[in-house]
Structure formats: structure tokens, C-alpha cells
Amino acid sequence: MDDKKAGAGVSAEKQKALAAALSQIEKQFGKGSIMRLGDGEVEKDIQVVSTGSLGLDIALGVGGLPRGRVVEIYGPESSGKTTLTLQVVAEMQKLGGTCAFIDAEHALDVNYASKLGVNVGDLLISQPDTGEQALEITDALVRSGSIDLIIIDSVAALVPKAEIEGEMGDSLPGLQARLMSQALRKLTGTIKRTNCLVIFINQIRMKIGVMFGSPETTTGGNALKFYASVRLDIRRIGSIKKGDDVIGNETKVKVVKNKVSPPFREAFFDILYGQGISRQGEIIDLGVDAKIVEKSGAWYSYNGEKIGQGKDNAREYLRENPDIAAEIENKVRAALGVVAMNPTAAAVAATVED
């Protein structure tokens, strides 16, 4: 009995000491700087923004890209990296979010962006001279708490000031990696607090002398690999033809890293030139997989009614009948256990209230 009383006394003292420590931390660093998971103040539901691709939203496991996180999208040239990020911008703008595009490559095509559904009049754009300037602008925008999405295009173009001011042949090893590491250390906490989604577009390089495993690596050192909650590897795997003309690319995206859901899932979709990701094409493919759309030979049918011979005609039918496309999409989402359309309405509303 005495041992139990002594144990209870020690436990009460520990609780008292813990309460005093928590009180001191909150006094010094502000309310919410430390909390119990069971108190319900920590968000369990992850707020997301759609990628514009139904298949990729499903592969991500939470219905889109998570807000308040860092995301990296990388792949070879002309694989669809900028197209995918511009689609995310369009989706965020549909929900009333404010977006910024840090164009370090100085290569943003405004006409193409508007064709993808981006409201270019409301898009904030910066074309910085140095990597430091680009990341300082990003930091200032994130800290403002009024930006929902920031795109940095691309990490490879974030050239340190010392390199720009130096001579062509100067050897400056590790400068860019140090710049990225410092910036991400500074940014991550603020990104989480302000619920801003920051997407880094990255390029691929080849490591020399690799005998085993993949020789591919991304630029800017290893920091981004660690800090990113989601990493997407995007590749062009084929061409889409209409007669003899190539009208788009068949694209594969692999979720290489995912801190919010199981990783290593893949999504396949079409990117049509001048139109972006073919939503209707995805609805057809996923509808066939889920047995919601029937395929017999070259014909596609829905509810016993033929909607087109060949994928191109079926895609055109769904473009002309958006109600049927939305109906099939919601059935596909229900079959795969993904939230019905507009998964980020609540997320944007929360930002507006803040």
C-alpha cells in the first residue's frame, strides 16, 4: 500500500512538473507551440488540392496534394512537369485560392497557362535574378499567410549569386545544395503554420560512373528529398495520334514518396497539346477499370447507351455532356473510396477565415 501511495505521489509530482513546463513553453513561444494529440487541436484531416488528374488524386491516397507541405515534381524534359503544376494552379483558383509562380527559368508561357484554365490576371508572377532572391520572395509570400499555393520553376534554375557574379569556368561545389538546405530549414515551419502548399519543379541529371542502380538524380542536393512530403516522378511513355498527327503524350506519374498515404502508386493519363490533362480520357479509363463504363470491341457504353466508337469519340462525347462525365466521375470516386468532387472547398474556406 505504501509503495502504491509513493508511486501515486511521484506521478502527481511528475504531472505537476509537466504542467509547469508546458505552461512555460506556451508563455515563451505562444499558444499551440506544444499540445497533446488527444486534445483534438491537431488536425487529423489533411486538407488537399486536386492535381487536375483524377487518377493521380486517387494514387496520392488523400484526393490531391496536401496543403501546408512541400511537394517535389521531377522528370525529364517535356514530360509534363509545368503542365501538371499549372493544372494545380487552375484547381486552386477555382476554389478562390491565391497562387504565385516563381519563374526562375524565365520560360512561363502565359497563353498556354490560360488555355489550361489558369486565371493569369490573378496569378502572381516573379522572375528573379538569383536563387537567393527567388527563395527570399518565396519566404516573404509564405510568411504573409495570404498565399495558398507557390510554384518554384525550377530548382535547377535557382543559381546562387556567387555563381552569377563569378567567371564561367569557376568551380563552386555544393553552393546550390547549401542554398536549398538553408532555405528549406527556414521555410518548412512557416509553410505548415500558414497552410500554404509549395511545389518545387526539378530536373533530372545523370550521375557519372554508376555501375548498379539508377544513375538518375535530381538537382539541388538532398535537402529537398528529405523535406518534401510528396515526391512525384513524371514521365512521357508514348504519343497520342489522330491520323498521322501527334496530338498529345501518354504520361505516367509515380508517387515516389508520400508522408500522408502509402507511396509507390502510379497514375496514367493523357496530356493533350494546348488542352492539358485529358479529364474525359481518365474518366473513360478509370470507368472501364471500375466496370462503370462498358467496353465492347472499340465501342464504349454507359448505362446501356453507346457513347462513342474509339477513345477519341468517347472523350468528345463526355466533353459535350459534362453532366454525364461528372456522374461517371463521382461513381468512379465512390467505387475507389475517394471523396466526391471539390475536396478543397473547406481548405480554402479555412484560409479565408484565418
Swiss-Prot record:
Return the SUPFAM superfamilies for the record: P-loop containing nucleoside triphosphate hydrolases, RecA protein, C-terminal domain
Record keywords:
ATP-binding, Cytoplasm, DNA damage, DNA recombination, DNA repair, DNA-binding, Nucleotide-binding, SOS response
Q: Does the keyword ATP-binding apply?
A: yes
SMART domains in alphabetical order: AAA
| Binding positions for ATP per the UniProt entry | 75-82
The keyword DNA-binding is annotated on this UniProt entry: yes
List where in the cell it is found: Cytoplasm
Give the UniProt entry's GO cellular component terms. Answer: cytosol
User: What family classification does the UniProt entry report for this protein?
Assistant: Belongs to the RecA family.
Matching NCBIfam families, A to Z?
tigrfam_recA
- UniProt function note: Can catalyze the hydrolysis of ATP in the presence of single-stranded DNA, the ATP-dependent uptake of single-stranded DNA by duplex DNA, and the ATP-dependent hybridization of homologous single-stranded DNAs. It interacts with LexA causing its activation and leading to its autocatalytic cleavage.
This chain's protein is named Protein RecA
Species the sequence originates in: Cupriavidus taiwanensis (strain DSM 17343 / BCRC 17206 / CCUG 44338 / CIP 107171 / LMG 19424 / R1) (Ralstonia taiwanensis (strain LMG 19424))
